[in-house]
Amino acid sequence: MPKDSFPTAAEYQDAPTRYPALTLIDLSNEASAIQEQYKNIVLSQVNNSCLRMSVIEGGYPWHYHPHSDELFLVVEGSLSIELADGRVFKLGPRQSITIPANTVHRTSAATRTVNLCFEQVAAETVFIDRPPALHE
């Protein structure tokens, strides 16, 4: 997937929240409604954090979040998370991992995958071309 098909860091940070507090969210309906190869929506906010739903088929560019950890929880499919040091985590349904702030990473999915992300509402996303550790 071309890099310019993803939202800019500013667009990602400014995404509106879909559901206010005390609103029932049906994750199956939300996931079924997304037809794009990549879509990331803010479902809800809790204090200074948010719950995002991401649907991905293909790869997401290398990036990091300077001031925010990011927790991934796979709902459907299989998500690979590659770190700049070469480690790769493969998550299936109901598996989760937290990526610490300042950790360069990228996600990919060979087939349609739905995951939830928990992070700060104002989490900054910094995109990079390729991590230094992989320039060899």
What does each of the following model-derived ranges do?
Residues 1-52, 132-136:
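A short, N-terminal "cap"/entry segment at the start of jelly-roll beta-barrel domains
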Residues 36-37, 50-66:
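Conserved short histidine dyad/triad with adjacent acidic residue
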Residues 47, 75-76, 92-93, 111:
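A cytosolic small-molecule/anion-sensing beta-strand core signal
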Residues 50, 59, 78-80, 104, ...:
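Structural motif
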Residues 55-56, 65-82, 121:
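Short, conserved beta-strand element in jelly-roll/cupin
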Residues 82-84, 108:
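A generic structural motif
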Residues 85-101:
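Short acidic-glycine-tyrosine-enriched beta hairpin
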Residues 101-129:
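Ligand-binding loop in jelly-roll beta-barrel domains
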